[in-house]
Amino acid sequence: MSKSKFPFPGKSLALRELKADPCYVKIPPKERRGVVERAWSIGELAACDEYQKTMGSNDFRSIFEDRGVSVETRNVDYVVGKQRYFSDYLSGKNRVTLYEKSIRLWAEENSLEYENACNLILSHEYFHYLECNGLGLTSRIYQVPMLRIGSLSLGRTGIHALSEIGAHAFARTYFDLVNNRSSCKEGSARECR
């Protein structure tokens, strides 16, 4: 893969990802940017931690296998509504499913080799694995009422887009670390430069 090509949304597009979330309108405008920054930072810090733990490995199939997570491929173009899905991480089954036809379309659109595209998608899913196995769900760092009737609020829900923003940040930061475009500060796996 070209060292300059990275097909996931960057930090500058993270707010757009948040705007697409159905709960976006429930977040006060003055808090939106801060929520995005926090989710992005969680992904960056997790990437630094994992990069050091894996000693810079960039083979996410092997990283998953080392953690007892199976990676399966289904030969489908998985589209629901207007959304194309490339993969799923099922924590209860400890399995990642890759949707081959969807990935091939995405790889072609982004001038990527199929295996490189799979690895990038697996890096994104690895963040979701981390969320379910110690990191905590990024979608819950900010919660909004499920239902509001006048001044009465019922229930609380997280913001799914924050988890996706964290996963994009993880994949982006890990990619940059592997390609020597970023580094973790010495002595601290918790901070990236």
PLM features per residue range, with description:
Residues 1-70:
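N-terminal leader/presequence regions that precede the main folded/catalytic core
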Residues 5-7, 11, 57, 103, ...:
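Metalloprotease/metallohydrolase-associated module, dominated by Zn2+-dependent proteases
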Residues 43, 86-88, 167:
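Long alpha-helical scaffolds
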Residues 61, 69-71, 80-81, 137-138:
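Polar low-complexity intrinsically disordered regions
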Residues 72-119:
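Active-site scaffold of zinc-dependent metalloenzymes
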Residues 119-121, 125-141:
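Catalytic Zn2+-binding segment of zinc metalloproteases
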